[in-house]
Design a protein with these regions (language model features):
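Active-site-proximal alpha-helix that buttresses catalytic centers in soluble enzyme cores
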Residues: 1-244
Length: 244
């Protein structure tokens, strides 16, 4: 029996950065050779979700959403477009397993810590997990808080807090939420796209990877979704789904 993995993402007709992490992690998984086949599919790019399974030769396929949290796309769009009816669907003689998104897995906390350390975080620093936030999807907020709690449980940093782009507590107030002299802010986003690369730095008036304000320092990390160790999270999701 051939085992395959299908990574699905949103994609964009306007920005290649949107799909770049999906392709990146697919390449990593292929190089590792853990699975017989690794494919990709998108909502806004080719190959489309509606035809993604057609490209798979494997008999047992695990579909992994490259999204930060569960919501409209993972709960409705992906299953509808791919004809999935639950965690396990049998389609044209194939067994298709559908996992939760990578961003909701507990192992993502290790990726957040890694991103912070890459940005120069030290044990005495504060870490701020930065989420998008949206009133349309309360699970988005809940997932950010859950990841921050998991990061705090690792015990690597003096303080761990949560901030958002589009809701309270707002990222602009990050210094008032912690007492540490240095704060490392890690974006809980999949891609280094428009928000991570433009709107957040502009709204925060960041000077670059490091910004100094009133004797304090803010370090801005790269998005968690582009970290190479996301491939480890994907493998863990596939391993868990194989027991279904």
């Amino acid at each position: 029996m051939k085992r395959g993995v299908l990574l699905v993402g949103h994609g964009s007709h306007l920005s290649a950065n949107s799909s770049a992490p999906v392709y990146q992690h697919a390449r990593t998984l292929r190089e590792r050779g853990t699975f017989d086949e690794v494919r990709t599919g998108f909502w806004k790019e080719e190959p489309p979700l509606s035809r993604a399974l057609e490209s798979c030769d494997a008999d047992d396929i695990t579909v992994v959403p490259i999204f930060i949290s569960s919501g409209y796309f993972t709960d409705e769009v992906v299953p509808r477009e791919m004809g999935l009816t639950g965690r396990v669907t049998h389609v044209r003689g194939k067994t298709v397993r559908y996992t939760p998104p990578v961003g909701a897995h507990p192992a993502l906390a290790r990726v957040v810590v890694h991103r912070a350390e890459e940005a120069g975080a030290a044990p005495g620093d504060a870490l701020a997990v930065l989420g998008h936030g949206t009133p349309r999807n309360p699970r988005s907020e809940q997932n950010v808080y859950a990841q921050a709690k998991a990061v705090a449980a690792i015990g690597r940093f003096a303080e761990v807090t949560t901030v958002f782009l589009d809701q309270e507590p707002n990222m602009r107030d990050v210094f008032s939420l912690v007492s540490a002299e240095t704060v490392v802010m890690v974006p809980l986003f999949i891609a280094d796209g428009w928000h991570v690369g433009e709107t957040i730095p502009e709204d925060m008036a960041l000077d670059g990877p490091e910004t100094r304000r009133g004797g304090r320092r803010l370090r801005y990390a790269a998005a968690v979704g582009t970290d190479n160790s996301i491939a480890d999270v994907i493998e863990e999701l596939v391993r868990e789904a194989s027991a279904w």
